[in-house]
């Protein structure tokens, strides 16, 4: 009787331990790995292909710092147009990542621009391109022959106010 009880408990424990492994495997396989590249840390995935990195500081109309959210990366596609309206939308998402629905974008710094730095294989030197932020916008260039993951950086101050 004791042998049967021990055998039953052993089988039961093995059954539960394998079910937890199966659940972890199925949960991890549901993540779409094609859109992201694994970085150094197992919990960090960066977008593959071009991306817009938004790193802003939220200030009031007098220049006093109100919010300094972490940077946020958004996948973008070559050939798409980034207008001022779209960029403000991305900035608001970055603000929401720190203080959800608390602030709205009033205005981007007039000197704000988006920059991308890459090694130009034709010129054989590092190249930096700047794109002004306008209502008309700019077309995201295809830099795939020079770099796999071009990061278009927006690093600026943004005038914000409470909603």
Curated annotation (Swiss-Prot):
Keywords linked to the UniProt accession: Plasminogen activation, Secreted, Signal
Source superkingdom: Viruses
UniProt keyword rRNA processing, yes or no: no
A single Gene Ontology CC term: extracellular region
Signal peptide: 1-27
Subcellular locations according to the entry: Secreted
Protein family according to the UniProt entry: Belongs to the staphylokinase family.
Function: Potent plasminogen activator that converts plasminogen into plasmin. It forms a 1:1 complex with plasmin, which in turn activates other plasminogen molecules.
Name of the featured protein: Staphylokinase
Originating organism: Staphylococcus phage phi13
Highest classification ranks of the organism: Viruses, Duplodnaviria, Heunggongvirae, Uroviricota, Caudoviricetes
Gene responsible for this protein: sak
């Amino acid at each position: 009787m004791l042998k049967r009880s021990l055998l039953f408990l052993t089988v039961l424990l093995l059954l539960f331990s394998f079910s937890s492994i199966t659940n972890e495997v199925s949960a991890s396989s549901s993540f779409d790995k094609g859109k992201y590249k694994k970085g150094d840390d197992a919990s960090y995935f960066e977008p593959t292909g071009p991306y817009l990195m938004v790193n802003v500081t939220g200030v009031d109309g007098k220049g006093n710092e109100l919010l300094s959210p972490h940077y946020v990366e958004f996948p973008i596609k070559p050939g798409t147009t980034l207008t001022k309206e779209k960029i403000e939308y991305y900035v608001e998402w970055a603000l929401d990542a720190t203080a959800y629905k608390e602030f709205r974008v009033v205005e981007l710094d007039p000197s704000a621009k988006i920059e991308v730095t890459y090694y130009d294989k034709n010129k054989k030197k590092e190249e930096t391109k700047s794109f002004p932020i306008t209502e008309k916008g700019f077309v995201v260039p295809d830099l795939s022959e020079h770099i796999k993951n071009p990061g278009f950086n927006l690093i600026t101050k943004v005038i914000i106010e409470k909603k």
